[in-house]
Each structure stands twice: as structure tokens, then as C-alpha cells.
UniProtKB/Swiss-Prot annotation:
Disulfide bonds join 24-43, 36-64, 49-53, 68-79, 80-85. The keyword Repeat does not apply. Pfam families: Toxin_cobra-type. Residues 1-21 form the signal peptide. The keyword Nucleotide-binding does not apply. Gene3D superfamilies: CD59 (2.10.60.10). This is Alpha-elapitoxin-Oh2a. InterPro entries: Snake_3FTx, Snake_toxin-like_sf, Snake_toxin_con_site, Toxin_cobra-type. Transmembrane segments: none annotated. Belongs to the three-finger toxin family. Long-chain subfamily. Type II alpha-neurotoxin sub-subfamily. It comes from Ophiophagus hannah. It comes from the Eukaryota.
Amino acid sequence: MKTLLLTLVVVTIVCLDLGYTLLCYKTPSPINAETCPPGENLCYTKMWCDAWCSSRGKVIELGCAATCPSKKPYEEVDCCSTDNCNPHPKLRP
């Protein structure tokens, strides 16, 4: 009986570990944490100025990615790989 219970515990742990998916904050508003699709194991925050930057601030994009998005000269890009590691910059402590 103990062997069966131990086997079930090990199988459960292995199955849960194989099924791990990352949680990232995503835009557009409202900003919610969502499960990333398989293969997308990074969270990212991308910020840039558009034509209305002086009046409303930078455009902020949050999401999941398989690789860190390319950074253009006028953009700020941050990537991370833990659950909910990309909060909206205005909401960071």
C-alpha cells in the first residue's frame, strides 16, 4: 500500500512539472495575468513614445514571448522568466 501511494505521489509530481506554464501580465487594459501558450517561456515589457507621448506618456505593451522581442532604437524592452515578473511600470513597488 505504501509503495502504491509513493508511486502515485511521484507520478503526480512528474506530471505537474511537465505541465508547467508561465503566467505573464498582458495588455491591453485591463491588465491581467494570463497563462502563456506552450513554447512562450518569457514575459516582456516593451515601452516607446508615439505622437501623443508628451500628453499621455509612453505606450506600454506587456505579454509572453518565445524569445525576447527585438529592441528598436526608440524602445525599452525588458524580459524575465518567472510568474508575473512583468508588472505595469506604474504599478511596480
